[in-house]
Structure formats: structure tokens, C-alpha cells
Amino acid sequence: MDHLEKIFGKTAQMTVLENLIEHQDDPTYISGIARETGLSNSIVSKVIKPLVTSGIVVERPLGKTRTFRMNIENEAANLITGFCNGINQIEV
């Protein structure tokens, strides 16, 4: 998702969002996002909260842990996902 970085800059929230979009069909954990992005668990936890609060990301308990994934039932999440996928298909 280098095109998004060129346009919006690299922020922790964009990095987490990009990771969730790349793995939108699979629920993931804070630790998995942290490992794949190079961010700390605490940073991922901090920046994912507004995405969950806004309904863009769904949080589900799984035992003592929580899983996260893009909310395919949320219009904003679908628009963001479509935009991200589309922007990567053009030259920027």
C-alpha cells in the first residue's frame, strides 16, 4: 500500500488500517498486527480503538484475547477498503 503512504504519509493508524485491509478476510490479533507492521502492541492497541469505536473495525472476544477485522457490514469500512484497493491499481 505504498500509494497511500505517498499521499497521506506514514502514520501508525494508517499502517494498522492497511494491515487490516490486506487481511480483511481473516480475523487477527493485536500481537499479529504488531508483528507484521513492526509497531508495538501498545501502539496498535491505542490506534485501533478509534477504528473500533467508529465501526470500521469489528472487535470480537476469543477466550482471553480479542480478534479484529474490517467490518464488511459498515459502509465507511467498505468505502475505505475500496479506495485503498483502487488507489493501489493506479500510478501515483
Name each model feature, range by range.
Residues 32-35:
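A short acidic, leucine-rich amphipathic alpha-helix
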Residues 61-67, 73-74:
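Short, Lys/Arg-rich nucleic-acid/phosphate-binding segment
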Residues 21-26:
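Short helix-capping/hinge SLiMs at alpha-helix to coil transitions
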Residues 48-49:
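Short, hydrophobic-biased segments on the C-terminal half of alpha helices
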Residues 75-92:
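Amphipathic alpha-helical dimerization/coiled-coil segments
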Residues 1-15:
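Short alpha-helical segments that sit at the start of domains
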Residues 52-62:
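A short, conserved structural fragment
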